[in-house]
Amino acid sequence: MEEIKVNDNTERMPMIGDPAPEFRAITTMGKVDFPADYKGSWVVLFSHPADFTPVCTTEFIGFSKMAEEFEEINTKLIGLSIDSLHSHLAWSRSIEDIDLDGNGTVKVKFPIIADISMAVAKKYGMLQTVAKTQTVRAVFIIDPDGYIRTILYYPMSTGRNLPEIKRIILALQKHDEDNVSTPANWQPGDNVVVGAPLTLQGAEERMASQDEDMVVYDWYLTLNCPTC
């Protein structure tokens, strides 16, 4: 059997719940010390394959249009690819001339990391193509304490669902504020999931509950109506 050789220099891919790997980098808005510079804010750190490419351009226009929406929920955006700073700047300027949907043009007002050395991309497991010469469409949602709460990867051919990224952040914030979970397709104002009881007695009490704010489907599935 052929022996498998392990490269000890390979970065361990971060996982949900891990502290966000630290780095210092040059961006289109100056130097950044991450995550220290963003303590107290949620962060969407996302990578794209390359500047001046069509799918990435639509994503950056979309992120730019939603930038204020993210700010309203205490969330900062940071882009990244292994292109140069000059490439990022030129691409950002060209984006300003594109009216994609007839609703006007936008400016890219969030920083884009110029990760030419691939140091940040390696720390975050963003290099997954065979040649490893492009970053994949990765998304890391990082909380105000600097912990990774969500990791998303998209195929090279598929643009990201930006409203879904915002929805995830809102769901995480709801969880942190009220210690509840959110069901499939949850939107702010919808019913939330109440934790299941951990004992037989608790299960029996849940089934017998007369709480008008709760909808009990079974002992393990209870929804709470936040607007009741």
Protein language model features and the residues they cover:
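Chalcogenol-based redox active-site neighborhoods
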Residues: 1-228
